[in-house]
Amino acid sequence: MNQNRNRIKYSIFLFFIFFITSLYSQNKYPIILVHGFMGWGREEMGSYRYWGGKYDIEKELRDNGYEVFTANIGPLSSNWDRAIELYYQIKGGQVDYGKGHSQLFGIIQKPKGKAFKGLYPKWNKNNPVHLIGHSLGGQTIRMLDYLLKTSIQDSSNIKEKSDFLGNINNGWIKSITSISTPHNGTTLSDIVTTGIPFLQDFIALGAVMGNSYYNFDLEQWGFNRKENESIGEYYRRMQKHPGWGTKNIVSWDVSVQGDR
């Protein structure tokens, strides 16, 4: 019965995706899938996909002629950090969170482990993309849209030096679609910090499902999994990270106060 329910849910979700893409059948602009809280990329969790579970929605869309990419950004990071990572994952290059933002929250502005070749390097106003975000992914896309359209200044009121934050890049996004996104925040955001009962087991399961374990992607905080560190120790150390006490983390962004 559970298997049938999963198939029904998958069929409805896939129908929704195809419905969205059919609205833009006049163009072949790429589709970028953006995961939500505790999400993961195609190279993590073995063959179990965030977008489709045992089924592979990206592959289904590709088989139907669409150019599709799955983003893999910080599952616990703030929408600012996630939007920055999303930009560089699509365009390519060294992640730069901005001088002002990095100084404000005490994070590493350009973490060495976060440089990307680019899913779609020719991305610009002449080659825009469709963005589909699930849950927190919808908020992240809205932040990306804002940052693309705004020239950001650092704490000294000097324009940020990165091509992304320092410039205005209108027309780079063809469409935005959000699925189950808490656009006005949620009163359930404390679940993020108090812990979800199955979360540790879920992450541990991911570690044995494939060649790549689940990663919290918090290099900007100087947080990495230690050599020979167990999944349990990695998870518990993450729970105690000082970043949770700041406004540069997922728990703040999904709260009612943080989303104002």
Role assignments for model-derived ranges:
Residues I20-S22:
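N-terminal signal peptide c-region/cleavage motif recognized by signal peptidases
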